[in-house]
């Protein structure tokens, strides 16, 4: 009995460490989290609802002058600034930002599905790969996916 208890304890510890070692890495936007068809729908919605302010090439809107420099009225949705702003954050944060604040003068106008489609287009535009499953329109299903600007190794 004295030997059995330590052996059981050791086996339990081995099981705990083994399960930690085989845990999957968190999903990222590099894992194909949207479909090409979804991004195509999102592109049409983007052009209709977003391009007037954020630009056809998702470059943002830099039309106000303050002193000698132009300041962006609305931020870019592509490129280094966009990637840097969202790097390391949860995809649910970006989805929620879009859902709560856009379109600028009609927040909440778009359905969750439309917001997911637009986000899929933004990801495609930023050269993240499409996959086989659509990006979920339920924000709680996006809390396990990280926005990583550089593809993990």
Regions found by a protein language model. Give the residues of each.
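N-terminal export/targeting leaders of redox proteins
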Residues: 1-33, 140-153
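Electrostatic cytochrome c docking/interface patches
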Residues: 21-45, 61, 106
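Gly/Gly-Pro-rich "capping" loops immediately C-terminal to redox-active cysteine motifs
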Residues: 33, 58-96
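Sequence context surrounding c-type heme c attachment/ligation sites in exported
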Residues: 40-48, 88, 112
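The canonical Cys-X-X-Cys-His
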Residues: 42, 46-57, 118, 122
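Protein kinase-like catalytic domain
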Residues: 54, 78, 102, 123-126
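General structural signal for alpha-helix termini and helix-helix connectors
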Residues: 79, 83, 100-108
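Flexible coil segments in periplasmic/lumen-exposed cytochrome c-class electron-transfer proteins
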Residues: 107-153
């Amino acid at each position: 009995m004295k030997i059995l208890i330590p052996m059981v304890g050791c086996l339990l510890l081995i099981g705990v460490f083994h399960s930690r070692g085989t845990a999957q890495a968190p999903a990222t936007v590099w894992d194909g989290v949207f479909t090409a068809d979804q991004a195509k729908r999102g592109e049409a919605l983007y052009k209709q609802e977003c391009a007037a302010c954020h630009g056809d090439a998702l470059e943002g809107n830099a039309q106000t002058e303050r002193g000698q420099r132009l300041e962006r009225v609305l931020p870019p949705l592509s490129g280094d600034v966009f990637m840097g702003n969202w790097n390391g954050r949860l995809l649910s944060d970006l989805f929620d930002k879009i859902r709560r604040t856009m379109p600028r003068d009609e927040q909440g106008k778009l359905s969750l599905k439309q917001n997911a489609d637009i986000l899929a287009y933004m990801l495609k535009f930023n050269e993240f790969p499409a996959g086989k499953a659509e990006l979920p329109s339920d924000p709680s299903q996006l809390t396990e996916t990280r926005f990583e600007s550089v593809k993990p190794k």
